[in-house]
Amino acid sequence: MTVKVWRGDKNGGAYQGFDVPRQDNQTVLDVVSWIQQNQDPNLSYRFACRVGMCGSCAMMVNGTPRWTCRTHVNKVLDANTLVVAPLRNLPPIKDLVADMDPFFDKWIEAGGHHNPSASRYDTMPQIAPDDTKRAVANESIECINCAVCYAACDTVAHNDNYLGPAALQRAWTLYNDEKVNDRDAVLAAVSGKGGCHNCHSQGSCTLYCPNDLNPMRAISGLKAATIKHHIKGGR
């Protein structure tokens, strides 16, 4: 098969073609690794666990963001051709390695870190597993920040200020966490210039999430919460 791999850096690049032998149960990550090991040792790419737990191997495969370790070639091969590139909406560092700093910077900007209302010396709060807010918060805790949703989002592509699906989903998780002290601060963080109301509800984030999460539903929740907060006199 023919594999076209993007080569370059932040200053630009182009696709380079490789002839790669087909194998049974071959993943896209297997293909990239074979190229690096057998044809071009200078090819740069990122991976770690190889079993769909870390998300670090995410790349664009035939125009779609995917975990390459869980993407089998026989499901995505088009006319015996595979096109592999770094994640969209992030600046490339080298070849297939995308710079994740903008993604995590926006995660922090959206208030993604936990601000507990109690200290280690306080009694641990008892929250029932079937508590409504606990259930909502639990919906998104399997996010591993792979940035597939960020790469899939057209709003991110056209709005540099937009926080992105993963950051907003994390904010929704914290907003529904009873242990968070200042929930108004969460809403303030996602109500600004790049906040939740920039989302066009196209649903690409939900469609392509490898963990079957629903960032669009989380963003819709934030939209409703920020509007209610504003109506009640919040700023």
Task: Indicate residue ranges for each PLM-predicted region.
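Iron-sulfur-associated redox domains of electron-transfer enzymes in respiratory
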Residues: 1-104, 150, 154, 158-159, ...
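Ferredoxin-type iron-sulfur electron-transfer modules in oxidoreductases and energy-metabolism complexes
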Residues: 26-41, 85-235
